[in-house]
Curated annotation (Swiss-Prot):
Active-site positions on this chain: 13
GO biological process: carbohydrate metabolic process; DNA repair; glycolate biosynthetic process
This protein's UniProt keywords: Carbohydrate metabolism, Chloride, Hydrolase, Magnesium, Metal-binding
UniProt catalytic activity: 2-phosphoglycolate + H2O = glycolate + phosphate
Protein name as annotated: Phosphoglycolate phosphatase
Assigned protein family: Belongs to the HAD-like hydrolase superfamily. CbbY/CbbZ/Gph/YieH family.
Organism of provenance: Escherichia coli O157:H7
Subunit structure, interactors included: Monomer.
Length: 252
């Protein structure tokens, strides 16, 4: 008996689950920091900040950059900088800069993970409604899905500005299930991070945790999803479909 035999719809996280968005996000973060004459962070560090939406990303970036600047100045024997702008205002300015730069680099800095398009196509062909739940600012979501040619697979898309409470709160998942016309326990949620699994548990949805993606350096099994997969196309046999062996290039 399949663990997911009662599933009537599937919803996915975006960043770290369907797409590798770290190159574009990191580039935009670093350009915003540079514009404020702050140290740049680099992709490896920015990856550990992804997952809670753009505002939290800016807070994490600014906190790190200010600390890094203080450390560098101390190492060079220079006095600390007294910021004229309060941290809250600096976060707001950083967010405006980030939005501008991310709009310029999002498409060229985002790539589908292997097997994503094949898996979405197979699930759609089976007749399962598919949803997307992301904390990414809503204005960036639709253009990105279109550019990657996966918008056609989703009947429901919820961005970070479409609900008052983002993941790990259950509200976005409950809204997707409602729009699909199914109960939360009939909707499988697939994600790569602690926030995704916590949201699924809170909403009463069964969950799949993927081992790749962005999870603050934690192993996904620590969040105790119902099932853990190494590849997104491992979903297919679990939902009664053949396992796709088609290879997709990250740069396709």
């Amino acid at each position: 008996m399949s663990k997911f035999e009662d599933i009537r719809g599937v919803a996915f996280d975006l960043d770290g689950t369907l797409v590798d968005s770290a190159p574009g996000l990191a580039a935009a973060v670093d350009m915003a920091l540079y514009a404020l004459e702050l140290p740049v962070a680099g992709e490896e560090r920015v990856i550990t900040w992804i997952g809670n939406g753009a505002d939290v990303l800016m807070e994490r970036a600014l906190t790190w950059a200010r600390q890094e600047r203080a450390t560098l100045r101390k190492t060079m024997g220079k006095p600390p900088v007294d910021d004229d702008i309060p941290a809250e205002e600096q976060v707001r300015i950083l967010r405006k800069l980030f939005d501008r730069y991310y709009g310029e680099v999002a498409e060229e800095g985002t790539f589908l993970f292997p097997h994503v398009a094949d898996t979405l196509g197979a699930l759609q062909a089976k007749g399962l409604p598919l949803g997307l739940v992301t904390n990414k600012p809503t204005p960036f979501v639709a253009p990105l899905l279109e550019a990657l040619d996966i918008a056609k697979y989703f009947s429901v898309v919820i961005g970070g500005d479409d609900v008052q409470n983002k993941k790990p709160h259950p509200d976005p998942l409950l809204l997707v299930a409602e729009r699909m016309g199914i109960a939360p326990q009939q909707m499988l949620f697939v994600g790569d991070s602690r926030n995704d699994i916590q949201a699924a548990k809170a909403a009463g949805c069964p969950s799949v945790g993927l081992t790749y993606g962005y999870n603050y350096g934690e192993a996904i099994d620590l969040s105790q999803p119902d099932v853990i997969y190494q590849s997104i196309n491992d979903l297919l046999p679990a939902l009664g479909l053949p396992h796709s062996e088609n290879q997709e290039s990250k740069n396709d």
